Curated annotation (Swiss-Prot):
This is Flap endonuclease 1-B. Its EC number is 3.1.-.-. The gene is FEN1-B. Interacts with PCNA. Three molecules of FEN1 bind to one PCNA trimer with each molecule binding to one PCNA monomer. PCNA stimulates the nuclease activity without altering cleavage specificity. The keyword DNA-binding does not apply. PROSITE patterns: XPG_1, XPG_2. The lineage of its organism: Eukaryota, Viridiplantae, Streptophyta, Embryophyta, Tracheophyta.
Length: 428
């Protein structure tokens, strides 16, 4: 979620703190990327062409197949299956494509993954889980009545980034030769710490709380490469403070008062009113002292002081060395993407060629200021867990689906791997 209403507040009250940039402006720059948020976006932004990744060179699915009947409305099931078919590999497709495009632009990405969430965020995570449960119920109803648009909408609302998604992307990035950081806590906080320590030039994310954690430069839309034409928006935290007329401590209080992931906000106080109150009173303590208690109800035991400490002293690793971008592991990528995840071998080969070409084009000899000195350790180990989808089923690995000319309105027939499919109540 980030900080409620902060984008609008900055657009109105600190317009000069944000500038529009081209991707090319970051050529030669080391950028910390919030990986976990990117993966969520990859899972949400799913198109039909994502299913191409599950086929071989002849367009055929290579897994063991069998068939089953799904006794639901004919015209809505393709939307549901298409979404989850693409979802199975969309995190890998998105991570591969966007990382390649960043490397081709001369950007040196460092992907930072979430660790253990702070205790104060667990209430927000529980709320999100309940929303996914509600979306699953809505999805079931949409399937029953055959509402194709609703099936697609509610399918996306059931999406959750799993450990499997994260582990897959870490493995992919390491095979690509791109550094990975596993944060002990919030990825945004670790990104901000790397930026504050001058180990990276900027932080790329969509959550505005990167600024609250103290990132000197914050980039939005950088990971939209190849999907949107939006320019990159760069925020400079020093200009944010200057334009708003606040200290960093006051800015943190503004963000807490506006609403964040770590505590409830005061109902009726959004970003605009929060800015006015902080400018008038200077800190949350004084705001509460002068707040109209009959108009605004402060949550009981409101932990704003603990949240303030979390933003100022987050759980981050201070012992991270500088980074090295290595040559891609061609054999490893082919095995992981093509053999294990049914990517087209030609697609993998082209991606490797692009990575190598970008590495040659922006070699340390040409960009001397980027010469790294040490690499982050870590290799992928352990048995892969199944991908758990927020759907009427549990673990699911769709292989292919096709309509049968002899199938009646009672349902479609689809070719799937039954051993990994669990549509509760939907399999006849």
């Amino acid at each position: 979620m980030g900080i409620k209403g902060l984008t609008k507040v900055l657009a109105e009250h600190a317009p000069r703190a944000a500038v529009q940039r081209r991707v090319e402006d970051y050529r030669g720059r080391v950028i910390a990327v919030d990986a976990s948020l990117s993966i969520y976006q990859f899972l949400i932004v799913v198109g039909r062409k994502g299913s191409e990744l599950l086929t071989n060179e002849a367009g055929e699915v290579t897994r063991q197949e069998t068939s089953l009947a799904l006794p639901v409305s004919d015209h809505c099931i393709p939307a549901y299956l298409t979404f989850h078919l693409c979802e199975l590999c969309s995190h890998l497709q998105g991570m591969l494509n966007r990382t390649v495009r960043m490397l081709e632009a001369g950007i040196k990405p460092v992907f930072v993954f979430d660790g253990e969430p702070p205790e104060m965020k667990k209430k927000e995570l529980a709320k999100r889980s309940l929303k996914r449960d509600d979306a699953t119920k809505d999805l079931n109803r949409a399937i029953e009545i055959g509402d194709e648009d609703a099936v697609e909408k509610f399918s996306k609302r059931t999406v959750k980034v799993t450990r499997k998604h994260n582990d897959d992307c870490k493995r992919l990035l390491r095979l690509m030769g791109v550094p990975v950081v596993e944060a002990p806590g919030e990825a945004e906080a670790q990104c901000a710490a790397l930026c504050e320590n001058h180990q990276v030039y900027a932080v790329a994310s969509e959550d505005m709380d990167s600024l609250t954690f103290g990132a000197r430069r914050f980039l939005r839309h950088l990971t939209d490469l190849g999907y949107k034409k939006s320019p990159v928006t760069e925020f400079d935290v020093s200009k944010v403070l200057e334009e708003l007329g606040l200290t960093m401590d006051q800015f943190i209080d503004l963000c807490i008062l506006s609403g964040c992931d770590y505590c409830e906000n005061i109902k009726g106080i959004g970003g605009q009113r929060a800015l006015k109150l902080i400018r008038q009173h200077g800190c949350i303590e004084e705001v509460l002292q002068n707040l109209n208690q009959t108009r605004f109800s402060v949550p009981e035991d409101w932990p704003y002081q603990e949240v303030r400490t979390l933003f100022k002293e987050p759980n981050v690793s201070a012992g991270i060395s500088d980074f090295t971008w290595t040559s891609p592991d061609t054999e490893g990528l082919m095995g992981f993407l093509s053999t294990e995840n049914s990517f087209s071998p030609d697609r993998v080969t082209k991606a490797v060629e692009k990575i190598k070409a970008a590495r040659d084009r922006y070699s340390p000899g040409r960009l001397k200021h980027l010469t790294p000195v040490a690499s982050l350790p870590g290799t992928h180990t352990g048995k892969e867990p199944k991908c758990i989808l927020g759907s009427p089923g549990q673990s699911l690995k769709l292989i292919n689906y096709c309509s049968s000319s002899s199938t009646s309105n009672a349902g479609y027939r689809y070719t799937v791997d039954l051993s990994l499919l669990a549509f509760k109540g939907l399999i006849s």
